[in-house]
Curated annotation (Swiss-Prot):
Name of the protein this chain belongs to: Sodium/proline symporter
TM region(s), chain numbering: 16-36, 54-74, 85-105, 139-159, 174-194, 200-220, 240-260, 286-306, 327-347, 381-401, 410-430, 438-458, 467-487
GO biological process: proline transport
Principal subcellular localization: membrane
Gene name of this polypeptide: putP
Function: Catalyzes the sodium-dependent uptake of extracellular L-proline. Since most S.aureus strains are L-proline auxotrophs, this transporter may aid the bacterial persistence during an infection of tissues with low proline concentrations.
Organism for this UniProt entry: Staphylococcus aureus (strain bovine RF122 / ET3-1)
Membrane topology: Multi-pass membrane protein
The family this protein is said to belong to: Belongs to the sodium:solute symporter (SSF) (TC 2.A.21) family.
Length: 512
């Protein structure tokens, strides 16, 4: 999902107590990294997927934390502060999309990826599912993951650097390197297990923060009457449809379409110990998400009353959470709340680093070394996986070194890119026996191209007609579905093994 994106301009005071809290947070992450390293067996599946042994609670919060990023704590409250309750449509779309994802994608993907050659990456699953002997589908989907996630990761590093610059007055590059070092350390050594455990830990911190800040803010304002004050300041602040057209509402709501194709989220379903644990994970995960998003909305709404009440000049709405945490809380608690922002940022970075690393190792290096070498030289492949984490991180840091780099403009559209290219393909692969390799490649590429074309040439025409301002995932998703279906109908049908496998997956999923 989006990170802070813009410069954080509000300076806040930090003392030794705040630094201690941040240091304790970093120390816990390092310890978890060591734990993950000690648990490692030298097996690639273990390093990249935790050996498919992750429990439901870690699965749930890991999926949520890696999904939300700094957007939930920084971006969403800032958006609600600026536009009012109408910004909540995106939270409705995301929650509904995540909920459906647990039902429609999670069980079948967990079973099918293990059945289809024990695939540990999404491109590997596509290859095995469609018997892609030429590896065309695997290479193209792998390239999409590597390119877009490198850009995605760099935006997280930028957010981390700017947080330290804003909250502590430290040099941006120092903050960037510090965040990068900690994330690289526990991801490099601990692999998937460490990333999942840290995501769980960070998810708990994020949830506490999103509940604590709006409650304390209301206690220091007018209690529940704060919302009455917000409405009195401007009645449309609590209007769910304020300033939104039908196109605008649909665009915000359609963010949920992207969930079916986000590699760093759906890989969590692949790693759970059993598909039978998914209902428990779903209940916790969706509850966490709903409470967290509602808390973020509440931060934005209470912020509308908080800023004038405390005579604060808020130059950047995205700094609202930082300012409220520093003004309302003791520095020690303020440090904990700043750690929550770091948790949101770092949980996403680590997940994206690992997915990109697994794609480089499993989808490219294995093609060079061969399947047999991969089976007999597991430790070599684990080391390549670790080195890939380092390489991707270095590239992302290099791009992030200049925070004003124009590549930042592309990152906000990565969700749509993955959603349009992978979401339809994942659904077809899990449910339709008629899907062909040609249909899969054509649909995936066409979805990505439509998103790029829409962003570059169609959206700038929004001033002519509102329809051109439609969120790019919608046309990209629709075109991908149509192209995948039509091309599959016109090309050679897959073997009978596909229907057999689909039936087997369906039967296993139905087992209680």
């Amino acid at each position: 999902m989006l990170t802070m994106g813009t410069a954080l301009s509000q300076q806040v005071n930090a003392n030794w107590q705040t630094y201690i809290m941040i240091a304790v947070y970093f120390l816990i992450l390092i310890v978890i990294g060591f734990y993950g390293y000690k648990q490692a067996t030298g097996n690639l599946s273990e390093y990249m997927l935790g050996g498919r042994s992750i429990g439901p609670y870690i699965t749930a919060l890991s999926a949520g934390a890696s999904d939300m990023s700094g957007w939930m704590i920084m971006g969403l409250p800032g958006s609600v502060y600026g536009t009012g309750l109408s910004a909540m449509w995106i939270t409705i779309g995301l929650t509904l999309g995540a909920y459906i994802n647990y039902f429609v994608v999670a069980p079948r993907l967990r079973v099918y990826t293990e059945l289809a050659g024990d695939a540990i990456t999404l491109p590997d699953f596509f290859k095995n599912r469609l018997n892609d002997k030429n590896n065309v589908l695997k290479i193209i989907s792998g390239l999409i993951i590597v390119v877009f996630f490198t850009l995605y990761t760099h935006s997280g590093f930028v957010s981390g650097g700017k947080l330290f610059e804003s909250a502590f007055g430290l040099d941006y590059h120092f903050g960037l390197i510090l965040v990068a070092f900690i994330v690289i350390f526990y991801t490099f050594f601990g692999g998937y297990l460490a990333v999942s455990i840290t995501d769980f830990f960070q998810g708990v911190i994020m949830l506490i923060a999103m509940v604590m800040v709006p409650i304390v803010a209301m206690m220091n304002l007018n209690g529940w009457g704060t919302f009455h004050d917000v409405a009195a300041m401007k009645p449309t602040n609590l209007n769910l449809f304020k300033g939104l057209s039908f196109i605008g509402t649909i665009s915000l709501f359609s963010w949920g379409l992207g969930y079916f194709g986000q590699p760093h989220i759906i890989v969590r379903f692949m790693s759970i110990k059993s598909h039978k644990m998914l209902p428990k994970a779903r209940r916790l995960g969706i509850s966490w998400m709903a409470v967290g998003l509602l808390g973020a909305v509440a931060v934005g709404l209470t912020g509308i009353a908080f800023v004038p009440a405390y005579h604060i000049k808020l130059e950047d709405p995205e700094t609202l959470f930082i300012v409220m945490s520093q003004v309302l809380f003791h520095p020690l608690v303020g440090g904990f709340l700043l750690a929550a922002i770091l948790a949101a940022i770092m949980s996403t970075i680590s997940s994206q680093l690992l997915v990109t690393s697994s794609s480089l190792t499993e989808d490219f290096y294995k093609l060079i070394r061969g399947e047999e070498k991969a089976k007999t030289h597991q430790k070599e492949f684990v080391m390549i996986g670790r080195l890939s984490v380092l390489v991707v991180a270095i590239v992302a840091i290099a791009i992030a070194w200049n925070p004003n780099d124009t590549i930042l403009n592309l990152v906000g559209n990565a969700w749509a890119g993955f959603g349009a290219s992978f979401s339809p393909l994942v659904l077809f692969a899990l449910y339709w026996k008629g899907l062909t390799r040609a249909g899969a490649v054509s649909g995936m590429v066409s979805g990505a191209l439509v998103v790029i074309v829409w962003i570059a040439w169609i959206k700038p025409l929004a001033h002519i007609n509102e329809i051109f301002g439609l969120y790019e995932i919608i046309p990209g998703f629709i075109v991908s579905v149509i192209v995948t279906y039509v091309v599959s109908k016109l090309t050679k049908k897959p073997g009978a093994f596909v229907e057999t496998d689909l039936n087997k997956v369906r039967d296993i999923v139905r087992e209680k």
